[in-house]
């Protein structure tokens, strides 16, 4: 079935270059999810009659009203084939039943339809928003599907502390403060924050670290922070720095730079060359930020610009983000769509899904018009709570901007075609090398990472015809207490057991007798069965892995291959352990060898990154984290009131009750936690 929830134990991979400034917030759900979750569907219940295809749809039409709404089409297995919306459900669905000539895609969908459901909505705009939300959640086979739909990163300047900090942020806006974005990539946010640190000397440490400082850290020494933790700068002076940073991010960059230039010149006139050099370096940092922004049209204050290039069965949609008159990056998308669809149809469906869980700007510019331009504008205006203008510029600065985005879309499309062709050849070579029945469409690569058994993490990365599928990466925190510290075999055994036990429970064991490859990994919701699993390990690891696969009864359902490091652990001398044959090596310049090395190295990188994140979290753990009922808000309130966790532990019950947001019951819980420990 499509549309299952992600497993509770699954952790989506956050593709960030740096994690030091990340704030991870749980509950980053689609803003429109409640809309879909509360839908009261009118089931067709016509599959009991044995009707299929156009005959079933014809019977279903008799029950449909002439009102706007959304309909779903199912196959015999209960998988959602298609989600559509209509101004008139009866007229729209009837088109599938009449004897008109359909495209191959529609004809195939109609033939497979074994059941249908519908729901009415008050307006067509409401139907459009619901349709987009359902397509993203259910990922129906015959719809245009938005891939790589990870949330965008923002810059957060906190507003709940005497010394605001600057962080990279993804997810729900749960913390008080000013959010600036969206940025196209985490790398762009990281570069911007680094430059803003040099320009405005704002802290990037967590509140718990801030409260425990007794002297300035290294960032103060290298002039990347003004040292508010130990009052190296007054609260008023620090507040001015923070306000300047907000002004710069709000588009008032010229005002900020002029103020700094005046201060630099004044310092030079006063012969205070050291202070003048500081202002010079801060100005250079701001110029560095702007140098990475590329094109910055003066007439575009807040807009997203979309351009599509459709060729060779692949569509590339390029998006540029402009906020406060600044270019905050761009990103290329490659939606899954039927090659017979026009570029306008692909773009139309893409736009509704794109803004399902993202803030909508005041203006959206397109490279070409779409059929439902006015309806989309009305729906997005209703969702955003402000007027959204959608236009296709014909001349002037905005047309030049759109042409620039079109050029980027064309270049990204060309690169994608080349990469896809190369990946296809490598997968075919992989098949020949290991004697597989078909070229694998989903390869899962596993690796463990730990230091003497501590903070052990298992990592899983996924590769397919379009490269690495990062939204399918998972990490497994090793939980078993029976594993001897440093026992790699035991750790891999736990990872395999958890991964495939859950998979069997939710998906069942696949029938591999047909020898047909699974769909492209990027198109399948998680969880789904892999064709091949690669294990970073030799004969010992593979013995443990194959024992688990045999115990679960899935030895014939998935091909397990081990990769042992070569002599002296040299790259290029790896030994492979496939099932049912002797181990072997590949020639040093074999493209398949490079392909496997790249997959193994990616699994290694991901596992190490997950381990480091877990270890870092363990190192900076605060004693307040161990108290049940003390979440981030109460923890922050206690630290702001008392300064340090040690001061909290020494506080009297009456002092704890005096903290804003701390009830008597919570205060008593905190007091008992520390004093019960002391008594022991």
UniProtKB/Swiss-Prot annotation:
Broad class of where this protein is predominantly found: cytoplasm
Location in the cell: Cytoplasm
Gene Ontology CC: one annotated term: cytoplasm
GIY-YIG domain ranges (all copies): 66-144
Gene Ontology molecular function: any one: DNA binding
Domain UVR: 254-289
Swiss-Prot/TrEMBL keywords: Cytoplasm, DNA damage, DNA excision, DNA repair, Excision nuclease, SOS response
Transmembrane segments: none
GO biological process: nucleotide-excision repair; SOS response
Family: Belongs to the UvrC family.
Subunit structure: Interacts with UvrB in an incision complex.
HAMAP family: UvrC
Function of the protein: The UvrABC repair system catalyzes the recognition and processing of DNA lesions. UvrC both incises the 5' and 3' sides of the lesion. The N-terminal half is responsible for the 3' incision and the C-terminal half is responsible for the 5' incision.
Name of this chain's protein: UvrABC system protein C
Organism this protein belongs to: Rhizobium johnstonii (strain DSM 114642 / LMG 32736 / 3841) (Rhizobium leguminosarum bv. viciae)
């Amino acid at each position: 079935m499509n549309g299952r929830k992600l497993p509770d134990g699954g952790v989506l991979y956050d593709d960030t270059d740096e994690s030091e400034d990340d704030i991870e917030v749980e509950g980053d759900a689609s803003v429109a999810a409640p809309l879909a979750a509360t839908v009261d569907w009118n089931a067709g219940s016509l599959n009991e009659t044995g009707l299929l295809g156009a005959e079933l749809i014809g019977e279903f039409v008799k029950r449909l009203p002439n009102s706007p709404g959304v309909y779903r089409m199912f196959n015999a297995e209960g998988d959602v084939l298609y989600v559509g919306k209509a101004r008139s459900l009866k007229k729209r669905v009837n088109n599938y039943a009449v004897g008109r000539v359909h495209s191959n895609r529609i004809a195939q969908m109609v033939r497979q339809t074994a059941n249908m459901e519908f729901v009415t909505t008050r307006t067509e705009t409401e139907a459009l928003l619901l349709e987009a939300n359902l397509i993203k959640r259910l990922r129906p086979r015959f719809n245009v599907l938005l891939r790589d739909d990870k949330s965008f990163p923002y810059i957060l300047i906190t507003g709940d502390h005497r010394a605001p900090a600057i962080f990279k942020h993804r997810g729900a806006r749960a913390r008080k403060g000013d959010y600036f974005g969206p940025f196209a990539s985490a790398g762009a946010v990281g570069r911007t924050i680094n430059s803003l640190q040099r320009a405005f000397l704002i802290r990037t440490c967590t509140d718990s670290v801030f409260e425990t400082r007794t002297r300035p850290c290294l960032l103060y020494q290298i002039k990347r922070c003004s040292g508010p933790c130990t009052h190296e700068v007054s609260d008023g002076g620090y507040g001015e720095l923070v306000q300047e940073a907000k002004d710069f991010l709000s588009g008032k960059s010229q005002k900020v730079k002029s103020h700094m230039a005046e201060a630099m010149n004044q310092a030079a006139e006063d012969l205070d060359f050291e202070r003048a050099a500081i202002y010079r370096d801060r100005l250079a940092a701001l110029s560095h930020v702007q140098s990475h922004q590329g094109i910055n049209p003066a007439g575009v204050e807040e807009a997203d610009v979309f351009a599509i290039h459709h060729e060779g069965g692949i569509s590339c949609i390029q998006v540029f983000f402009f906020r406060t008159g600044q270019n905050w990056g761009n990103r290329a998308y490659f939606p899954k769509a039927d090659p017979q669809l026009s570029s306008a149809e692909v773009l139309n469906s893409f736009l509704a899904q794109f803004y399902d869980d993202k803030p909508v700007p005041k203006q959206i510019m397109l490279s070409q018009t779409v059929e439902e331009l006015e309806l989309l504008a009305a729906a997005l205006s209703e969702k955003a709570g402000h007027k959204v203008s959608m236009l296709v510029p014909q001349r002037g600065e905005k047309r030049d901007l759109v042409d620039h985005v079109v050029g980027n879309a064309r270049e990204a499309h060309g690169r994608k075609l080349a990469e896809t062709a190369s990946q296809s050849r490598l997968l075919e070579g992989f098949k020949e090398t290991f004697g597989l029945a078909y070229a694998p469409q989903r390869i899962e690569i596993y690796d463990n990472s730990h230091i003497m058994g501590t903070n052990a993490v298992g990592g899983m990365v996924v590769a397919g015809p379009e490269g690495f599928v990062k939204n399918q990466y998972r990490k497994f925190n090793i939980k078993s207490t029976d594993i001897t510290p440093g026992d790699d075999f035991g750790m891999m055994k736990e990872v395999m057991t958890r991964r495939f036990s859950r998979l069997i429970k939710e998906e069942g064991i696949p029938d591999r007798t047909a020898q047909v490859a699974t769909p492209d990994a990027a198109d399948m919701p998680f969880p789904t069965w892999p064709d091949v699993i690669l294990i970073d390990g030799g004969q010992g690891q593979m013995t443990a892995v194959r024992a688990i696969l045999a115990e679960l009864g899935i030895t014939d359902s998935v091909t397990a291959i081990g990769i042992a490091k070569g002599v002296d652990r040299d790259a290029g001398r790896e030994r492979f352990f496939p099932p049912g044959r002797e181990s072997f090596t590949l020639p040093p310049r074999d493209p398949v060898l490079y392909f496997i090395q790249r997959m193994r190295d990616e699994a290694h990188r991901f596992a190490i990154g997950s381990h480091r994140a877990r270890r870092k979290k363990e190192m900076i753990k605060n004693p307040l984290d161990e108290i049940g009922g003390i979440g981030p808000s109460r923890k922050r309130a206690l630290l702001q009131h008392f300064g340090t966790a040690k001061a909290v532990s020494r506080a009297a019950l009456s002092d704890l009750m005096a903290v804003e947001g701390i009830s008597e019951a919570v205060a008593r819980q905190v007091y008992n936690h520390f004093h019960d420990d002391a008594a022991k």
